[in-house]
Amino acid sequence: MASTPPHWVTTTNNHRPWLPQRPRPGRSVTSAPPSSSASVSSAHLSQTTPNFSPLQTPKSDFSGRQSTRFVSPATNNHRQTRQNPNYNHRPYGASSSPRGSAPPPSSVATVAPAQLSQPPNFSPLQTPKSDLSSDFSGRRSTRFVSKMHFGRQKTTMATRHSSAAEDALQNAIDFSGDDEMFHSLMLSFESKLCGSDDCTYIIRELGNRNECDKAVGFYEFAVKRERRKNEQGKLASAMISTLGRYGKVTIAKRIFETAFAGGYGNTVYAFSALISAYGRSGLHEEAISVFNSMKEYGLRPNLVTYNAVIDACGKGGMEFKQVAKFFDEMQRNGVQPDRITFNSLLAVCSRGGLWEAARNLFDEMTNRRIEQDVFSYNTLLDAICKGGQMDLAFEILAQMPVKRIMPNVVSYSTVIDGFAKAGRFDEALNLFGEMRYLGIALDRVSYNTLLSIYTKVGRSEEALDILREMASVGIKKDVVTYNALLGGYGKQGKYDEVKKVFTEMKREHVLPNLLTYSTLIDGYSKGGLYKEAMEIFREFKSAGLRADVVLYSALIDALCKNGLVGSAVSLIDEMTKEGISPNVVTYNSIIDAFGRSATMDRSADYSNGGSLPFSSSALSALTETEGNRVIQLFGQLTTESNNRTTKDCEEGMQELSCILEVFRKMHQLEIKPNVVTFSAILNACSRCNSFEDASMLLEELRLFDNKVYGVVHGLLMGQRENVWLQAQSLFDKVNEMDGSTASAFYNALTDMLWHFGQKRGAELVALEGRSRQVWENVWSDSCLDLHLMSSGAARAMVHAWLLNIRSIVYEGHELPKVLSILTGWGKHSKVVGDGALRRAVEVLLRGMDAPFHLSKCNMGRFTSSGSVVATWLRESATLKLLILHDHITTATATTTTMKSTDQQQRKQTSFALQPLLL
């Protein structure tokens, strides 16, 4: 039976039949899609995309991502060139890069040669080893870099080159002799070519075919025979632009300097072309230097120049507020931005996940009546997905056909990847189904993303089908494909499959990259296979690769989870010596470890100069090189993973001191915490022996984020009425994160509240999480599923669920025959642990004399008959047991806080916190 097409293919209905209606309950869209009716005058640009320098962009505090490297390896090198088949072959007059395009003869701005005794002095470049090596195939190195080069309007002017130029081009392409013979060939066409238009056409078309050697040879031939300075300037601009497209920035710089010294490179267009060339190679500092130099020589930047420098700064990784200064400057100088300008700014927002700033820019394009194209939409989608706003991204994707802009493979792949990173795999797969229905062919990136999803959710057969389909359409497995398989199987704990895939990868001569090794080490470490991780690290070192922050963070996380926190801290010093700066993920592991039951035991002794125990005598003979240091730690993990000890209460203050020291380091390095950091801090508070210690940690939380502190502190003080509105706003932010990150925050907050007696508050937070679907399918009338909850959240939820069951009984309804409470410690449990949650729930049920008992066939399941539970709920004493109360009064908490503050002040010297408070 033929499928019914999606409504929006033929009508304006935006709903897709494969997907649940948006917005999802509990995942509400925080703001509407961009509106074409928005009207903001240019005078108010500073309010919509504010005066860009002080723009109020969304903070990265709630990115919640532990590591983009491990989340989705399938998103690397996603190029939009695949949707632009004419990119590598443009007729003359259709500029391959407006930033480097040649000026009309009548508009060339020049400076007299007498004023230019010396060319600008540019800093030395970090350029490719070989100026004309075959490495430069014209492909962009990253999805981000390529994305913004296709938002330009195509030139529609009539073709200005002659048929003789086409003949000369074909002869040049077919030529295979030496330079002298090439020169003779071009001489034979000299009388037939019609000036610089023909020459510019030949230069660009040779460049489009990656014949840069011949392009340079022809340029040198043509520029010597051209006597007019402005025409020579056109040729120089075209040559620099062509070289820049292919990363040959050293040659482009030489061409520019020669032209400048000859008096025909002193044009806005030549400078703009060189700026663009630097930008395409990620050399934004050099691009800015050229930009400043042209102003020193009396040249006024035009739209092409500003677009080039903005694009260069974005590609170079400059912060948005810094890039926006050029936007402010161009407007002050009366240069009005166009679509290229906005697309470049959108790309900066995309890289940093600044989705609110991206939406402001997008709306401003509408206000200025600047038409958005598919690249504008794709970049907006990328920013929104990176910001975790998946419902909004879905709505914008649906809006595109209504705006007569059809989504392409990049549009779908961007949103699909966003859903996958958010753990919303069903929606990602539904979009893949829609792509197939609409006839949008999957490319390598799409296949790799789909493969990554199937392996992560354990659908091995579908993953194999995708591999077979890739082979059938001629797409070979590359390093991204293998990384997706390794990451997916690793997350599923299928380590035999991991080994098979890695063996096949080497057999097929696909070279592992840094991500491959990081994925393997992270997967093996999390699975406790430290010997395997150590062997992978040895291979990694022998391959001559250098560890990065992701690999170090994976090892540090493994050390922390095994109680070897001191060794983890010492490894931070090692990575710093290697010139690798720790990031928020690194410190989150440390904070979380101090807040859990793992102990520093022997690692603390090592950090004070003690010796490490090793699994073999060979390890102890290793020298203290960086590689051997890591191998030693793997040896320690192998030994310690089977020899954990319980936490000694006397270590509490020592660990508290270490957490405060970690905070100090984060402040010094200006590392902004995210929601994972906040969850780790709350976990640490839950394990403090006294309210005073917890208050000290919360005071540090205030330095990081006063809003989060206000909500947490208010709830802990029992001031729910005063802070609940702010709490709702905080929960909105948390709900933008992926499911596991959001549930971790709710678990940590409820644990802390429960630990310090705010049990009613813990219950309200747990119910809020349920209403927002933080824990999906957590309860029904017959079952309460607690396997994704912490101890505090689970106990609070048991009370709430039983009260709900009681209301059903008193409404006269019959309960199901069997009631179940699942704790995730049974045969099919998704939780790896020691059954602490099960024991906590068991103690709670016994304390209430609830008629639930452990199932004989499932040690993680408590069951009871509905009739027995109904009888128990009707007992007069039961209601009193079920209703939770807070056991810390505001007055008591305030007094304790005051004492804690005094205690903290007395200890400021030892914790070295005083400079941070100034």
Swiss-Prot record:
Transmembrane segments: none
Source domain of life: Eukaryota
Transit peptide, UniProt annotation: 1-41
Residues covered by the Smr domain: 781-873
Sequence ranges of Polar residues compositional bias: 1-15, 44-87, 115-136
Chain segments carrying region Disordered: 1-138
GO cellular component: chloroplast
Gene ablation phenotype (knockout): Defective in retrograde plastid-to-nucleus signaling.
Localization per Swiss-Prot or TrEMBL: Plastid, Chloroplast
Biased composition annotated in UniProt, kind: Low complexity: 28-43, 90-100
Primary location recorded for the protein, binned into one broad class: plastid
A single GO molecular function term of this UniProt record: DNA binding
Record's keyword terms, sorted: Chloroplast, Plastid, Repeat, Transit peptide
Any one biological process term the GO annotation gives: chloroplast-nucleus signaling pathway
Each PPR repeat, start to end: 232-266, 267-301, 302-337, 338-372, 373-407, 408-442, 443-477, 478-512, 513-547, 548-582, 583-619
InterPro entries for this protein: Pentatricopeptide_rpt (IPR002885), Smr_dom (IPR002625), Smr_dom_sf (IPR036063), TPR-like_helical_dom_sf (IPR011990)
Primary role: Involved in nuclear gene expression via the retrograde plastid-to-nucleus signaling. Plastid signals that depend on GUN1 can affect photomorphogenesis developments, such as cotyledon opening and expansion, anthocyanin biosynthesis, and hypocotyl elongation.
Family membership noted in the UniProt record: Belongs to the PPR family. P subfamily.
Name this polypeptide is given: Pentatricopeptide repeat-containing protein GUN1, chloroplastic
